[in-house]
Amino acid sequence: MNAKINVLQVIPKLGYGGAETGCYDLAHYLAEQDCGSYIVTSSGELLKFVKKNKVKVFRLPVHSKNPFIIIFNIFFLSILIILNKINIVHARSRAPAWSCYLACLITRRIFVTTFHGTYNFKSNIKKFYNSIMLRSKLTIGGSNFIFNHINEKYGEYLNKNKKLRVIFRGINIDYYNQKNISILKQEKIKKEWNLSNDKFTILMPGRLTHWKGQQKFIESLNILIEDYNKINFQAILLGSDQGRKVYTKKLLSLVERYSLTKK
């Protein structure tokens, strides 16, 4: 009989972003497959939804880029890894990845990373900081675009002993099955968001950040009205600005400029 595999995922905050929901979904999937499933994070909105009888959560300041806190995290991650007999450590962000990498060296565990975005690097120091995501035994790219980006920008950190694979992001379609959402809850949301049953609804989910394309989305809505005379719709931008107040104000200003406040 094969020994049970214990997997530890480490992420700065367990919020509503793509990396975070991926971590959440995988944690519960692992538990369903009779694997030991563990998460280390500092905080996050999704924590209250974690099924504690299936997934064990530890709170550590893994969101911090402070070198002293990173060293602190190395020590405590090493203890967690040993005490819980962790086999695989999966880091989903750069700051905690440094702690995970060194903790895995100490405990001789398998280190895995997921490269979630095109991290900025304006200097060699920043590029070195980003390179931690490629110091694992396996680096996962979430798309062909990210895969090509890694090969193009970080080729010097790749070698035959390090695996780079594309694993596309999936979703749990049960979340979006209308049958799983009560009529009462549906009506409550419609009332809170002032949604009409008689209008075509367009939803754009995602963090409010310029490269997600919310500005283009708003401009496209204006084109629907001005060029195609399509007016019977309502649109929703759903996501956190994560402190990007200037960008949020820019979007609101754009909505007003195109007279879309009632849309």
Regions found by a protein language model. Name each.
Residues 68-75, 110-112, 117-136, 148-157:
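Nucleotide-sugar donor phosphate/pyrophosphate-binding loop at the beta->alpha transition
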Residues 91-97, 115:
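Short His-centered aromatic/hydrophobic patch
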Residues 56, 239, 248-263:
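Nucleotide-activated donor-binding/catalytic signature segment of Leloir-type glycosyltransferases, i.e.
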Residues 136-178:
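A short, active-site helix/loop in glycosyltransferases that binds the activated sugar's phosphate group
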Residues 39-45, 171, 205, 234-249:
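Glycosyltransferase donor-sugar binding loop
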Residues 4, 9-17, 21-68, 155-163, ...:
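N-terminal strand-loop element at the rim of the active site
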Residues 20-25, 200-226, 249:
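A conserved mid-protein helix/loop that constitutes part of the nucleotide-sugar donor-binding site
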Residues 177-195, 250-253:
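A short helix/loop element that forms part of the nucleotide-sugar donor recognition site in Leloir-type
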